[in-house]
Amino acid sequence: MAVHVVRFGDTLWKISSMYGVPIQTIIAINGLTSTFIIPGLALYIPDNMLPNRTYKIKSGDVIWKLAQQFHIGPSTIIQANPGIDPNRLRIGQNITIPSPLKLAIRTLGFMMPSTISANVSTLNSLANELTYLAVVAYSITNEGWAFNLMDDSAIVSRSWQLNIKPLLVVQNVAHGDFSAELVGQVLENPTRRKNLTESLVNLARQRRFSGVSIDFEFIPPAKRQDFILFLRELKTALGSLILHVNLPSKTADIPTNRIIGAYDYAAIARIADIVAVMTMDYGYAGGPPDPISPINWMEQVIQYSLTQIPHTKMQIALPLYGHDKIVPSNRTTMLPVLAAQNQAISTGAPIQFNNISKAPWYRYWHEGMEHVVWFEDIRSYIEMYKLVDLYQLAGTTYWELSFPAPQNWAYLKNNITVVKR
């Protein structure tokens, strides 16, 4: 695997010759619209090298044992880590191990039903890269009844045909926004909780879902225990069906906080089959220009989360979108990562890379107004997958599958094994 960051004077022809990869392959894998490129653009160049694994040294580790574990020669590990003393490995030290044993994870992609042809086309193209399909098409009434917002039958049917397990995503959405009042009213009332549990189980079974994915956001902190009661009741009723729960990111438990206070990570993890921590929107819509998922913050979230959630149950979220912000108003437009990349090319804006957050960004002007764009590229995605490997997490989630992210999917296909079970 190679990543080429474009410099002044580079051309696709020059890069193609350098790596021995056809220009059209580079264009396709990176989603380019022409042969024009700009400084700072990161290009993913596929090759036949072994995938790199990321490993944290533990007590008792020695090079020859690691070589056996990862099916590689000791000299390969030593060559991949210049500067380390193979006879004095430090506990907690991170090393790179080229290995034929790929990282194996369970992936989940969120999809909002739109046109059947577009949804099915997306599923067809990503069939081998998804374990679960989370269908975002359900909300709840004031009385707790879950209901369908749009037709999802074709998506569910196609996902089964492609060996992707469909999950019913239910949200506390009212009038287009997440409603704390709505979910609070339902969770606090035993009858409404019962309505919600029964309707979710019935819908999941009737519509042939393999389980339910809960996405209740801004639950009032006072309803923390009610949420646990609901999840326990729901899991009991679901039986062998999957209970997947999405949780807001945090680095400490603050029970009174209006955004994260209602979510008792440890208690939820004891009930749910899979827990997805939404490691996104550090840089949020309407806020100042910031990376959406800075790697240093993501690692802090993971480290806290693993004190509460077993690593075998935990997924982290990878954004497939960027934010285009007008400065200084911070008016924000969400755009797919591919659109963000190609907008930099079309405006001629050199792409910068922040080494602390491990995220790309650029600045451009339109109609006299300054725009700052943060997004993800192959470099930031690689860093995120390193965290999954380093902390031995269950896998990843992606918001949202309609956002093209060819670099991410190409890397996943070439370097990672997606578990189908």
Q: Model-predicted segments: where are they?
A:
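Intrinsically disordered, low-complexity Ser/Thr-rich linker and spacer segments
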Residues: A42-K56, K65, P86, Q93-I116, ...
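Glycan-recognition patch characteristic of GH18 chitinases/ENGases
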Residues: P100-L196
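Hydrophobic faces of well-ordered beta-strands that scaffold small-molecule active sites
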Residues: T107-M111, T131-V135, P166-V170, V212-I214, ...
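Glycan-binding loop/region signatures in secreted carbohydrate-active enzymes
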Residues: N172-F178, L182-V183, L320-M384, N414-R421
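Active-site groove signature of glycoside hydrolases
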Residues: N195-D226, I274-P288
